[in-house]
Amino acid sequence: MGEPQITNDFNGEILLSLVSLVRNRFSPNKETMASDFVTNQEIIIAARCNLTDNVWHYLTGGAESETTMRRNRFGLDSLVFRPRVLADVSKVDPSTTFLGHNLSIPVMLAPIGSLQSITPEGGLAVAKAAAEFGTINFVSSVTQPSLEDIAVASPNPKIFQLYVQGDLNWVENLLRRVKQAGYAALCLTVDTAHYGRRERQMMDRWLPPSRRGVGYEYRAGLTWETLDAIKRIAGLPFILKGVATAEDAALAVEHGVSAIYVSNHGGRQLDHGRATIDMLPEIVDAVRGRAEIVLDGGIVRGSDVLKAIALGARAVAIGKLQGWGLAADGQAGLLRVLEILKDEVVTTMGLLGVTRLDQLNSNYLCKVEPIPPAHEMSAFPHMPGGRLL
């Protein structure tokens, strides 16, 4: 394992003891299994121990001041529950569907580029973990191995995420492969017209392999007319990723999308943006049930998942937490992340007094001042402030 650096704005004694505990318990020299992890906090620390600084900063960092990234947690930490009691919660069902496909819990695996930098299997590990757990994974167009290899790695439905890197002929050739490989839907990412200034990576003098020498001018030129053309070429259920306002959500529905993916790219693109959970209510109002809604951004707990569901999302997607699971122990580490999330979801549903997700609504939530001060790791009590490691 690598040697993590403890920053001055952390309680170094607590964090060092946690790192030491995880290193001793999950040393590469010991016979350990991912099932030995009992919290996702342990998994995150193990991930940090396994990753180089460059890859850690790529996975965990945000754009410029990282304000948008921190607001994702601030928004979630500002919502608290209003539970109901004396309900029979002896049987809790956390399952749902997305675009007609079954999900064991309302959590999908967000697209991540350069997965091969995090785990040797790259996208294969994600596909296998998703199938074993019972969820959908979004396959990034800038990860390895090929979209065909990932498609046949497991039987679960997969959604192909598209970064436009060429003209419509280029798009048509790529989407022909996507359809032949049997992908269930297409997800077009539209919040990367320019590549965000990710200063942790810049100071490392490092960019992931998938970001080098790519034709960003094509993404900078995307319009609603381009979306229509890509949608016609695809002939698949169509998801628009990167929607952040009611205005664009309404336009997306008018252009016939099947689902809207509320996202600020994990705070890695536009600095000083809103938390995705704060965007959600206005987008739900604008969509009015005409498309399904998925959200990512700061989701690391089962309670986070249920906050999004209560505000009208059909499901959420996890990015950073997915990557941390992979870094901790590959496919098995990611599967353990999902198992822990499911346990948290079921426990929280029972304590809220609900047995089905469709019983949740905004009456189960209210706003408060977050405590402790929100940051990207504030869902984990022994990581008290600022950047992790």
Spans of model-derived segments:
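Glycine-rich active-site/cofactor-binding loop and its immediate structural neighborhood
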Residues: 104-142
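Glycine- and other small-residue-rich loops at beta-strand/loop junctions that grip anionic moieties
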Residues: 61, 115, 119, 139-140, ...
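An N-cap/entry alpha-helix motif that binds or orients negatively charged groups
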Residues: 15, 22-103, 198, 205-222, ...
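N-terminal pre-core extensions flanking Radical SAM catalytic domains
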Residues: 339-358
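C-terminal helical cap(s) of enzyme catalytic domains, especially alpha/beta-barrels
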Residues: 276-282, 327-345
